[in-house]
């Protein structure tokens, strides 16, 4: 009986270790994805601001 208990305990420990590794892996991926998303959002906002500024300048020049 103690041999079966040892095998079951070892199996449970392996499952816990595997699950913790998977959670850590996907957490790291989520953090990297969020950083990329934030960086791209900042760049897009900057590009949109530049386009708006150019359009305003173009209208001002056309008005002259």
From Swiss-Prot:
GO biological process: viral release from host cell by cytolysis
Residue numbers on the Cytoplasmic membrane side: 1-3
A matching Pfam family: Phage_lysis
Subunit structure: Homodimer; disulfide-linked. Interacts (via C-terminus) with RZ1 (via C-terminus). Part of the spanin complex which spans the entire periplasmic space. The spanin complex is composed of spanin, inner membrane subunit and spanin, outer membrane subunit.
Residues on Periplasmic side: 25-64
Protein name: Spanin, inner membrane subunit
Role summary: Component of the spanin complex that disrupts the host outer membrane and causes cell lysis during virus exit. The spanin complex conducts the final step in host lysis by disrupting the outer membrane after holin and endolysin action have permeabilized the inner membrane and degraded the host peptidoglycans.
A Gene Ontology cellular-component term: membrane
Top-level taxon of the source organism: Viruses
Location in or out of the cell: Host cell inner membrane
TM stretches of this protein: 4-24
Key word Transport present: no
Species of provenance: Enterobacteria phage PA-2
Membrane topology: Single-pass type II membrane protein
Protein keywords: Cytolysis, Disulfide bond, Host cell inner membrane, Host cell lysis by virus, Host cell membrane, Host membrane, Membrane, Signal-anchor, Transmembrane, Transmembrane helix, Viral release from host cell
Record-stated family: Belongs to the lambdalikevirus i-spanin family.
KW Membrane (keyword) present: yes
